Amino acid sequence: MVQLTWPHAKTDWAPMLDEITETYNEMTATIRKYEDLLIVGEPNNDTWARDHGFITLVDDQGGAKLLDFCFNGWGEKFEADLDNAINRRIYDEGKVKGEYVDCLDFVLEGGSIESDGEGTIFTTSCCLLAPHRNQPMAKAEIEERLKRDLCAKRVLWIDYGHLVGDDTDGHIDTLVRVAPNYTLLYIGCDDEADEQYDDLKKMEEQLKTFRTLDGEPYKLVKLPSPRPIYEDGERLPATYANFLIINGAVLVPTYNQPDLDAEAMKLIGEVFPDRNIIGIDCRSVIKQHGSLHCCTMQYPRI
């Protein structure tokens, strides 16, 4: 099941509500072909289900633990009290199934972590160590908390790669995604004149040093960066890494850049050969500095 938290006139989407609703309707129609859908309505501050939704763990017997972490508007940048109450509400209403686990003493957004399902958590230093999240906890303390709550063996920290226009302090789901067969898909940049070039190059070099738990290098697949997109003179954090994996398909954000959209979809399709690759125009979504994966949260069938 996939959760979408719906935009409305009391959110920041108000000036472009018709435009974003059209995009959400397209996402809804596409996802419903493959999975059940949970639509969450008011009250909510915003619509980024990836960050305020439960983070789910599934055990070997198929049981689920629904981890309810604190969401504080990406380090107290925005109001989040209503979003932070959504998980308890949908759990009490019976819309999600599993064991409720209260983790509200720790700030963690779903978009800030990636897991390989085998014990490794990937995250970014600039996000999890950012002010107004879990300070005064030190990096080592945060790492131990992640390993404990997420039943992980280790945490790999990425120290580079912040996208211009990103107000999450560098969520990993805009930069690096985990795929089958020890594959990491990551955003690259070949234009030395691009302001993101140096940082993304450093990220690429760091990824080359990472090893699996068996000591082998990861298979790295470089996704293109979309050409810069601006709104009111400010660059928006468009990225192809923010794709959504669902049963039978991968939904890929596109930006009306046919050559790069097609290249990204081809590369993602090669990594997920057993799934349909479907493009979703996300030019509306990035006007609020997120994309496809950010809008959604998955839950297992229990």
Regions found by a protein language model. Give the residues of each.
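The feature marks the mature, well-folded catalytic cores of soluble enzymes
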Residues: 1-302
